[in-house]
Amino acid sequence: MTKNINIAIDGPSGVGKSTIAKKLADHLNYVFINTGLFYRAIAFYKDKFNLTQDLLVKELKNIKINYVNEDQIFLNNQDIAPYLRDEKISEQASEISTILDIRNFINQIIIDTMKVKKGYVIEGRDTTFKLAPDAEVRIFLDASSPIRARRRVLQNSQLNTESNYEKILDNINKRDYSDRNREVDPLHVAQGVIAIVNDHMNIEETFEKILGLVNEAIDKK
């Protein structure tokens, strides 16, 4: 019987973390956790009620997130998944991710979930060093900002969502700066994490490289 492990994938926005993590989870029949969608859910709540950051923190006690998968995310019993890819929500999610109370709120939900069993693919910032530091496979996936912007434009076009390359590139650069320089858990390659730069790799090539590392880890169990 194959033994399950945990896999954590970290990295900047738009690098393909979600796509790769979902593909791995499907292939291995694991549970996929996209941590960024938790922040987007909180950002959606903030935007919906036009809250300041201080009021948002006070409202956390009234927020219940039920994460089924990336296509079903319930916020106080409302499925909000279709709204979470909006660029405005994405920008606000990055802003509120610097708030310690919000990070702790979301982190605890995820940590409690992963205590139950092995067999998770968790994707998002902080995953490799805070949420899943003991994961058997920890990856930091990276790519240049122009490459990531072009990928985002392509992704949006496939979803029939209009987008502007220059605006997306500017947003990515601003988000990178914010994520790498924030006081709370800045984006970085943690000790023992395998860094993979996939500028010149497509999704399938990136998937196969990481799957090879996963199979090696499973064989060692």
Curated annotation (Swiss-Prot):
Swiss-Prot/TrEMBL catalytic activity: CMP + ATP = CDP + ADP; dCMP + ATP = dCDP + ADP
Domain of life of the source: Bacteria
Alphabetized UniProt keyword annotations: ATP-binding, Cytoplasm, Kinase, Nucleotide-binding, Transferase
Annotated EC: 2.7.4.25
Positions bound to ATP: 11-19
InterPro entries for this protein: AAA+_ATPase, Cytidylate_kin, Cytidylate_kinase_dom, P-loop_NTPase
Main location: cytoplasm
Gene Ontology MF terms in the entry: ATP binding; ATP hydrolysis activity; CMP kinase activity; dCMP kinase activity
Family: Belongs to the cytidylate kinase family. Type 1 subfamily.
HAMAP family per the UniProt record, alphabetical: Cytidyl_kinase_type1
Protein name as catalogued: Cytidylate kinase
Organism: Mycoplasmopsis pulmonis (strain UAB CTIP)
Gene: cmk
